[in-house]
Amino acid sequence: MSKRLYIVVEGQTEEEFAKDLMAPYFLDHGIYIYPTIIHTSRGHKGGFVNYEHLKNDINRLLKSQGEDVVVTTFVDFFRCPELPGAEDCSRIQNHAERVAKIEKAISDDINDWRLYPYIQLHEFEALLFSGSFLI
């Protein structure tokens, strides 16, 4: 049985990465990937402006799809305004721990077992231009 994975992405770069590199891998495992860029306003997409836009897109996907759907996110950590738990986590020095707590807070806020939030710790575009020997 196949599954569908909707990835709510920040912009065109993440969308292309999901389509061109992730989709073929997941398709081999019976998972169809559908990246969707965050709606920031009526008729506009891209750029992570606020949490409500992200939450609205996630909820729209979860409500309009069946049980065979999983939703995740692909947004940069430094562009995460007003996320649930962000203020409580601001004292955590380890950024990976901070991201994990914020992902958990998003999951708790939306409260649907089909949601697996993912926040990219380092700006995705910066990773594309770094030497692989540095990573």
Q: Model-predicted segments: where are they?
A:
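Residue-level detector of well-ordered alpha-helical segments, enriched
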Residues: 69-70, 120
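Activity-critical C-terminal alpha-helical subdomain
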Residues: 77-135
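Short, surface-exposed loop/strand segments
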Residues: 1-69
